[in-house]
Regions:
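Internal alpha-solenoid helical repeat scaffolds
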Residues: 192-367
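Linker/hinge segments immediately adjacent to helix-turn-helix/homeobox DNA-binding domains
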Residues: 27-41, 446-468, 472-474, 478-482, ...
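Amphipathic alpha-helical segments of tetratricopeptide repeats
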Residues: 149, 169-170, 186-190, 221-233, ...
């Protein structure tokens, strides 16, 4: 091979050619290839890192802590004034250091990264801590709080950890394992913790989210003691901290709307500023896609709960700068939907969307989306964005919690219409254990997973899970979630021919539903309950439920038919499929643009991308003819 070919192979294989070379070198030296017990990383370090100067080795070791880095970052975290030339030399000589397409960011191949980290662990402990602290400062200054927390934690710099906890207000902190945060607190000196009362408030709320109530109460006592131990603290700041403590403690009365509101009013009376530990851009529903599922706690009290919500939310908004704004409108819209009052639901939904527009509260927008998708199966109105569009939009926000909520809505919708292959993988393959859900929102995820099991025909699984799920709902006063689980279980029993059990469950649900005028939970499960409902006494809302159920199933069938696309179109996104079908129906670009509210230029770009994905070539007439043929197959 020529030198050029060797270099090309090296870069094309992202360095794996070097790994093959190292194996062959072992064969030449020892007469055997490395076996399964050989450490390729030790071989790599011996060949690629140890021959370097100690200064270059230290440079690589420190950069090994970063997933990606720029020249500016490299200089900051290594304190090498010549970092740019060091990187340029490494990139030119080594395929294991790659410049990314943006032209400014670099990345180590994972073999180089692993070996660099091993080398880092050989540096003096104080050097390691200083380097990690520099990483923490770099990430903190750029708002990359998750990375900053890990860096400061690794450096045992708990002032840094607590400072970032305060700035983050628990938003990204929720993505860390609680055990890691508790480990930091165990190693943090009390006097360091007491220097950061606002961080203590954030940690109290995080402990509630993780259901670590004893730790939450212990932090409260430490906070109050720290306030009392500061005679120099102004009365105003004492009031702010004590008021915010009341605000956080209100979560212990979670979903007791009136009880929570009493503490919100106490907080409002003491505070002269909005809460620092709760930010508008943070989550409000603990990952639940539904507000009503969180706060409907007792059959027959729905109207009281709606009135309490209307009364209490303004007090909460006052002390949190509008956190969760629109929640009462969403809850009222959901209640109207469940009562079959579709126009009222649409009006409330439009009001909620208008209230939260451009205020940065993505959690509430996602709750609106959840209601919009459920409504669409009754009204035929298409939500503002399809799931793929919404997912792409959320990806730019780098918040896994928002994607989890979207996935739950996506899963529930496709389970309702019976399109199980379109359900997001985490629900379709039942991998919820791999996702870190906050405790108050987890029962809603379990409910949705149950709906997926039902759609997949896994009836025994639904029945087997029900007792544990209902026990959790009872403990958390989740009356609406329990109603859905009972209906799912009744449907599963009916499908397995266990009519007596199904009937007993359905009779209980009908009694509870009648107390609040709820019909849609039954309608959403009509596919499984139809024979049983027909056999029930035709009184109360049962005839109305049957009528709505028939219409609902007809609309679901229509949605399934519309979404049925040729096999070849499965490589296209949903939007591309829609456009491809319109092109095949011989609509012009202008007509498609008007129908889908796009510009003609956008339609043209979509069409070109469709042809490229489907490998359709030729002039315009030939391409359209081929597309029509594909739809007919």
């Amino acid at each position: 091979m020529s030198d050029h070919q060797v270099e090309q192979l090296l870069h094309t294989t992202e360095g794996w050619f070097s790994a093959a070379y190292l194996s062959l070198q072992t064969l030449a030296e020892r007469g055997t290839l490395p076996d399964g017990g050989s450490d390729i990383y030790t071989m790599f370090s011996a060949a690629m890192i140890q021959p370097l100067s100690l200064r270059r080795q230290a440079f690589l070791a420190m950069l090994g802590l970063a997933d990606e880095f720029t020249e500016e970052m490299a200089q900051a975290v290594t304190e090498y004034a010549d970092a740019a030339s060091q990187i340029a030399d490494l990139t030119a000589r080594n395929a294991f250091v790659t410049r990314l397409p943006d032209g400014v960011t670099y990345r180590f191949h994972h073999m180089m990264k692993e070996c660099a980290q091993r080398t880092f662990r050989t540096l003096p402990p104080e050097s390691q801590q200083r380097c990690r602290r520099r990483y923490g400062q770099w990430y903190e200054e750029r708002g990359q709080y998750l990375q900053a927390l890990r860096a400061y934690g690794g450096a045992e710099d708990f002032d840094g950890v607590l400072r970032v906890v305060e700035k983050d207000a628990g938003i990204l902190l929720a993505l860390l394992p609680p055990e890691q945060v508790l480990s930091w607190l165990d190693r943090c000196l009390p006097e360091v913790l007491e220097r950061h009362p606002l961080a203590m408030l954030v940690l109290m709320r995080s402990m509630f989210n993780w259901r670590r109530i004893p730790e939450m109460l212990r932090l409260k006592e430490q906070l109050l003691a720290a306030i009392d131990a500061r005679p120099d603290m102004s009365g105003e700041e004492r009031g702010n901290l004590r008021g915010e403590c009341d605000l956080i403690m209100s979560f212990l009365l979670y979903n007791d709307i009136a009880g929570m509101s009493r503490l919100h009013r106490s907080a409002s009376a003491q505070m002269s500023r909005p809460a620092v530990s709760i930010r508008r851009q943070g989550g409000w529903t603990f990952g639940s896609p539904s507000v009503l599922m969180m706060f409907h706690r007792q059959a027959g009290r729905l109207d009281c709960e709606l009135a309490e919500m209307d009364e209490c939310m303004p007090h909460y908004y006052c002390v949190t700068n509008g956190h969760g704004q629109g929640a009462e409108h969403i809850m009222r819209g959901e209640a109207a939907f469940l009562r079959g009052q579709l126009d009222d639901a649409r009006i409330a939904l439009a009001g909620a969307y208008a209230q939260i527009r451009d205020n940065g509260q993505e959690n509430m927008a996602l709750c609106c989306d959840h209601l919009a998708w459920r409504l669409s199966l009754c009204t035929g109105e298409t939500p503002r964005q399809d799931f793929d569009q919404r997912r792409r939009e959320l990806l730019f926000q780098h918040n896994a919690a928002w994607l989890n909520i979207l996935n739950s809505t996506d899963a529930y919708y496709h389970a309702l219409i019976g399109e199980t292959e379109s359900i997001p993988e985490v629900f379709r393959e039942h991998r919820l254990a791999s996702v870190r859900y906050l405790a108050p929102g987890k029962p809603m995820m379990e409910l949705i997973e149950n709906q997926v099991y039902l759609a997949q025909g896994a009836y025994a699984e639904v029945i087997g899970r029900s007792q544990q799920l209902l026990a959790v709902c009872d403990a958390m006063h989740y009356a609406l979630v329990a109603m859905h689980v009972q209906l799912q279980t009744a449907g599963a029993c009916e499908m397995l021919g266990r009519r007596a059990e199904a009937r007993g469950l359905l009779e209980q649900v009908l009694q509870d539903a009648a107390a609040d005028g709820l019909v849609m939970p039954v309608v959403e499960n009509y596919r499984y309950l139809a024979p049983l409902l027909a056999d029930m006494p035709q009184r109360g809302d049962v005839p109305h439920m049957i009528e709505l159920g028939r219409r609902y199933e007809a609309r679901c069938a229509s949605v399934r038919q519309r979404s049925a696309v040729p096999m070849a179109f499965h490589v296209l996104t949903p939007r591309e499929r829609d456009i491809a079908m319109l092109v095949a129906a011989r609509l012009s670009n202008r007509e498609i643009a008007e129908k889908l509210y796009l510009s003609e230029g956008s339609v043209k770009q979509y069409v070109n991308r469709i042809y490229a994905k489907l490998f359709i070539e030729g002039d315009t007439r030939t391409k359209r003819k081929r597309l029509v043929e594909m739809t007919q197959h």
